[in-house]
A protein has these predicted regions:
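Nucleic-acid substrate recognition interfaces
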Residues: 1-124
């Protein structure tokens, strides 16, 4: 409904809009139930610009050989990948810092491996 009225909303990834609504809902729930302060935009002195998008049908991919990240509504983006990972990608948060650079933080689900119990104690002074 809003996308018909505001055409520019079609340019934005739908999960970015959905996550924004979830964040706003959580802020109002805390305000009414946990007696937190009234939710307000913190953009007066905060230059933190970011959004989070979720994965669906493989719309977020990382190519370690070509150093590229595929994000929804964007082409393949050239990236400096600092470490490799294995597991299923859950979401990606894209941030712009005040210098104008962009950073992508990728949330990955991996299997939890428990360490074996050794029955030895270690003391640290």
């Amino acid at each position: 409904k809003l996308k018909k009225e505001y055409e520019w909303l079609k340019e934005v990834d739908k999960f970015a809009l959905t996550n924004t609504i979830y964040n706003m809902d959580a802020a109002y729930r805390k305000f009414f139930k946990e007696h937190a302060g009234y939710p307000k935009f913190k953009s007066k002195h905060d230059n933190h610009k970011s959004y989070t998008t979720n994965i669906t049908n493989g719309n977020i991919t990382v190519d370690f050989k070509c150093n590229r990240v595929k994000l929804p509504k964007l082409k393949d983006v050239k990236a400096k990948l600092h470490r490799s990972f294995s597991g299923q990608i859950k979401s990606a948060t894209i941030s712009q810092v005040p210098s104008g650079k962009y950073y992508v933080s990728i949330l990955v689900e991996t299997e939890h491996m428990e360490l074996p119990h050794t029955n030895q104690n270690t003391g640290i002074d």
